[in-house]
Amino acid sequence: MGIVEPGCGDMLTGTEPMPSDEGRGPGADQQHRFFYPEPGAQDPTDRRAGSSLGTPYSGGALVPAAPGRFLGSFAYPPRAQVAGFPGPGEFFPPPAGAEGYPPVDGYPAPDPRAGLYPGPREDYALPAGLEVSGKLRVALSNHLLWSKFNQHQTEMIITKQGRRMFPFLSFTVAGLEPTSHYRMFVDVVLVDQHHWRYQSGKWVQCGKAEGSMPGNRLYVHPDSPNTGAHWMRQEVSFGKLKLTNNKGASNNVTQMIVLQSLHKYQPRLHIVEVNDGEPEAACSASNTHVFTFQETQFIAVTAYQNAEITQLKIDNNPFAKGFRENFESMYASVDTSVPSPPGPNCQLLGGDPFSPLLSNQYPVPSRFYPDLPGQPKDMISQPYWLGTPREHSYEAEFRAVSMKPTLLPSAPGPTVPYYRGQDVLAPGAGWPVAPQYPPKMSPAGWFRPMRTLPMDPGLGSSEEQGSSPSLWPEVTSLQPEPSDSGLGEGDTKRRRISPYPSSGDSSSPAGAPSPFDKETEGQFYNYFPN
């Protein structure tokens, strides 16, 4: 016991030679597949039981080899797993002075001084808009908005009365003690000792910065001091902070910070823990945390220099509503004076008598002539107008849209043809004054043409009756005049009403019946429907 057999090296150091296959058959290693130690005997194959260790140990569980997975020549004897030592598949820590494990698959070798599992590194990059100081973590709430302005070099307006910042400073704080009291304030410091000027579309340095300007450079949050739970409950906003260039400002000194124009500044957030009984003015470096965000740098100006910054302010600042309204009102007045474009069912020209002169630019089916008996009507696609009877002949459409008829006076001019192919400018057509009516009116129409009724002979002379316009509808003549003998020329020829016997004299005889007798009135009443 304790003597290592010759030809067998230490397995831990990797010096054990591979067993030779000479003189060994396939069944020679069957006795080595499983190892059964004798009671009270130690495992001779475990090199850790050698005399070099000097300490005995008790045997553990056996780990047999997987049957049938390897050939006999490649089967290694099993090794007992001892409590307190790594089992199969586990690794020993690297020995002292070793270089650790070699790099594998492109991964560098770990630092041996850091052990097998090195701890986290503290120099990792923080995400944008987040700063850490000790246990406190502060995030810039409107980081994305500040980044947009920072791409074009943020500008802040300063005035005598003071102007609020936009974007304003807003932070989210974490890591404070809920019951401790903290004081928060913002100060503004110079970024460099240069004077800036906007030239050729960019900001360039020109000369040295002016001397320190007297005035307030500190703005304390109105809620200070307060508990940590109060500060962490919601965002800490400095929206009431104002910037001014008035050196002798005496009003609202605590709400304004005095700056110089054309200088670059950097705002900073200070969080100071206030102890009980300690004055607010007293602060030490041990309980003060300062947070700086590079994207909040700005150049103080009295008027915006970069047009990109001006547009960003108008688009994102809710207080710039007046700028947007003035800009939009310049075009709103023009839009209101111009009528909206007509719809597809609206005719652009209102003068129907001159429609044939435009080569039928806006044709409308069944406009001047009645529709075919079997043709369906599209009540939506046809336009509707309310005009004189000589301009329209589709009374059914008015009834469909529930419009009341109204008689409008007809303007003098050429009449509209009611037949297909009729040309107003035909030679000899002239400009007739009397309207033309279709041979047969629609029985369902709401309008009935009016014709002239004879007047009382005692009310006026025949010349006045002949010159008076037609006001009464045409009815079947009692006795037609001799001039109306040509009835075969057309049904559309007008016929004059004469209740008296035909004669060459237009004056009525003394014994002629009155047109207002009962017999005469009955024939007029038969014309009108009940």
Curated annotation (Swiss-Prot):
The UniProt record lists the keyword Transcription regulation: yes
Cross-linked sites for Glycyl lysine isopeptide (Lys-Gly) (interchain with G-Cter in ubiquitin): K313
InterPro entries: p53-like_TF_DNA-bd_sf, T-box_DNA-bd, T-box_sf, TF_T-box, TF_T-box_CS
Positions where Phosphothreonine occurs in the chain: T55, T302
Impact after mutating K313R: Significant loss of ubiquitination. Loss of phosphorylation at T-302 causing loss of its ability to interact with NFATC2. Loss its ability to activate IFN-gamma transcription due to loss of DNA-binding activity
Effect of Y219F: Significant loss of ABL1-mediated phosphorylation and loss of transcriptional activator activity
Keywords: Activator, DNA-binding, Isopeptide bond, Nucleus, Phosphoprotein, Repressor, Transcription, Transcription regulation, Ubl conjugation
Outcome of substituting T55A: No loss in its ability to induce IFN-gamma
GO biological process, one term: positive regulation of transcription by RNA polymerase II
DNA-binding feature ranges: 140-325
Effect of Y117A: No loss in its ability to induce IFN-gamma
Mutagenesis / variant outcome for changing S508A: No loss of interaction with RUNX1. No loss in its ability to induce IFN-gamma
Modified residues (Phosphotyrosine): Y76, Y117, Y219, Y265, Y304, Y525
Recorded consequence of changing K208R: No effect on DNA-binding or its nuclear localization
Cellular localisation: Nucleus
Feature: compositional bias, Low complexity: 498-515
Keyword NADP assigned: no
Residue ranges, annotated region (Disordered): 1-55, 444-530
Quaternary state and interactors: Interacts with RUNX1 and RUNX3. Interacts with ITK. The phosphorylated form (at Tyr-525) interacts with GATA3. Interacts with ABL1. Interacts with RELA. The phosphorylated form (at Thr-302) interacts with NFATC2. Interacts with KDM6B. Interacts with SMARCA4 in a KDM6B-dependent manner. Interacts with CCTN1 and CDK9. Interacts with USP10.
Record's function text: Lineage-defining transcription factor which initiates Th1 lineage development from naive Th precursor cells both by activating Th1 genetic programs and by repressing the opposing Th2 and Th17 genetic programs. Activates transcription of a set of genes important for Th1 cell function, including those encoding IFN-gamma and the chemokine receptor CXCR3.
Name of this protein: T-box transcription factor TBX21
Lineage of producing organism: Eukaryota, Metazoa, Chordata, Craniata, Vertebrata
